[in-house]
A protein has these predicted regions:
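The conserved Walker
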Residues: 43-45, 102
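Conserved lysine of the Walker
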Residues: 48
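Hydrophobic positions on the alpha1 helix immediately C-terminal to the Walker A/P-loop
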Residues: 51
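Walker A/P-loop NTP-binding motif
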Residues: 54-61
């Protein structure tokens, strides 16, 4: 079986290629005193949150359930209590960051925070079905 995989991979027909490019990009960004904000998008029930958690766990060995948030209050608490260079996964950030609620004070507070908190060295992954569901001000500061 391995011979067949090698045969097709050498000809550019592999189903997927494994590369450390993504991990190297994240590590390089962190090494240059930057943080990571990322949107994890895809159809509902397809594993966006699980993937985000796996990324966070690989990047931060201390990542745990307290770093998974579902609303603004949990997000604020996680940001205040987590260590430097912590990773936070915000599942379905519709509450507080919805593109339809751009005029609400809570939305303004969160987007301003996301635009200015790099010095705290916190990293956030947002899991949601479409990037357009999150406020534009938050989208533009996301790395991916």
């Amino acid at each position: 079986m391995m011979e067949a995989q090698t045969f097709w991979a050498e000809r550019g027909h592999a189903y997927y290629y494994q590369s450390d490019w993504f991990w190297n990009e994240l590590k390089e960004r962190l090494a240059t005193d930057k943080n990571v904000l990322g949107l994890v998008t895809g159809h509902t029930g397809r594993g966006k949150t699980c993937w985000a958690i796996k990324v966070a766990r690989r990047m931060d060995e201390t990542f745990g359930p307290d770093n998974i948030v579902f609303d603004y209050n949990q997000f604020r608490n996680a940001m205040e209590t987590s260590h430097e260079y912590a990773w936070i996964v915000w599942d379905e950030p519709n509450k507080g960051l919805s593109h339809r609620d751009w005029f609400l004070d809570i939305n303004k507070a969160i987007t301003t925070y996301l635009q200015t908190f790099r010095f705290r060295h916190k990293n956030v992954l947002f899991a949601l079905p479409k990037a357009s569901l999150i406020d534009k001000s938050a989208r533009v500061v996301c790395l991916f």
